[in-house]
């Protein structure tokens, strides 16, 4: 059944921004629309990930605070590994923090 991803993205982003939820996890068809919507929120760094290594890099280098996965293009097994990688990987900081500090307009 079709749904409007902004109806889910905005409450999730607000919950992460408020510190009520950390990190956030979203699953959508391709993941693109919900990731774009999430990233409209100040302080949100939603990363579209479909493999473990992408999820690790999203945390290590980008300090992503919401994991977005493409439900149509990821198996349940790969989704499980991707979530585990995202949740267990710390942010490296250093030069990556400097880059993140340059994101807000």
Predicted regions, residues:
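Short, structured active-site "lid" loops
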Residues: 7-30
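Alpha-helical structural signal in soluble globular domains
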Residues: 15, 37-41, 85, 102
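A general structural signal for well-ordered alpha-helical segments in protein cores
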Residues: 9, 31, 35, 79-80, ...
């Amino acid at each position: 059944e079709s749904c409007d991803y902004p109806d889910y993205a905005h409450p999730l982003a607000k919950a992460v921004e408020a510190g009520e939820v950390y990190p956030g996890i979203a699953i959508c068809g391709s993941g693109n629309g919900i990731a774009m919507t999430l990233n409209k929120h100040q302080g949100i760094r939603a990363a579209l990930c479909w493999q473990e290594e992408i999820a690790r890099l999203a945390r290590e280098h980008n300090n992503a605070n919401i994991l977005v996965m493409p439900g149509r293009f990821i198996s349940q097994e790969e989704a499980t590994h991707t979530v585990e990688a995202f949740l267990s990987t710390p942010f490296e900081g250093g030069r990556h923090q400097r880059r993140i500090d340059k994101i807000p307009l």
